[in-house]
Amino acid sequence: MPLRVPTRALAAALVLVAACRSTPVVVASKPFTEQRILGELLAQTIEDAGLRVHRKLGLGDTLVLDAALRAGKIDTYVEYTGTALAEVLHDARRGDASVIFATVRDAYAAADLEWMRPLGFDNAFAVVVRGEDAAKLKVTKVSDLGAHAAKLVAGVPRGFGDRADGWQAFLRAYGLHFTRVRQIDPAARYDALTVYDAFGSGASVDLVIGDTTDGEIAHRKLTVLEDDRGFFPTYEAAPVVRRETLRRHPELVDVLNGLGGTVPPDVIRQLNWRVDGEGQDVAAVVRAFRKAQR
């Protein structure tokens, strides 16, 4: 004899399912180009899975997004393992990529947050100098700066100094002493074009803390110095999602993990350059990238 499901119970269940499907997945990002690209990548991928998306791209920095995620104001964004380790967990440990990923994954799990598969690149901090200066001073690694630091002007983004992986800790690790340090506006910290304009005519700084995925580095013929003392941890990019969101939309596990390994370093540099260097629209750049992946 077939089971009878009470009409009211069935109706209530259908309403609940419909509500879950109609509730948009809130995708956020930090306010710099690479993050907007990655946020848009999440958004378009989720939309293609048949879910509605509400974009909050450029919402705020790491701590703003972390607080919003834990409070349920957003559902997902792309974070970097080394940033989570230093800024969120206040952990100064070092290790290979797998150790750092496991550390942040386990710590976030206690807050009901899930780290998905890394996207395929490590966006590490980098000490960047003009190519011609690197050749003239014969510097290839950060420790080579010791003999020249007193003559150089360092450009440091505001907010970088207080991190466990920040400026002061960096100076101590390398024993460097710069007599002139200029702070860069926070917006320029993540805007490769603005930061590296400092290397144009009448440059105000001689080196800057940049990102290894900045498209401007190659196009402006700048040089990244080797972090020969391994000061900076790895910064693998990966989506972080509320587990409540995954329970509501279980298909997101495969959808987001499917992005794992699809954005290697050379690709993210190209995408960053298309937006920062060529002025292309973020959404259009992501659509073209996804089309090429199919």
Which residues are covered by each model-predicted region?
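Short helix-initiation/N-cap motifs at beta->coil->alpha
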Residues: 55-67, 158, 179-195
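Beta->alpha turn/N-cap motifs
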Residues: 58-62, 72-85, 100-101, 202-215, ...
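C-terminal motif of bacterial Sec signal peptides marking the signal peptidase cleavage site
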Residues: 17-19
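An extracytoplasmic/periplasmic, membrane-proximal ligand-sensing/linker region
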Residues: 161, 165-176, 250-294
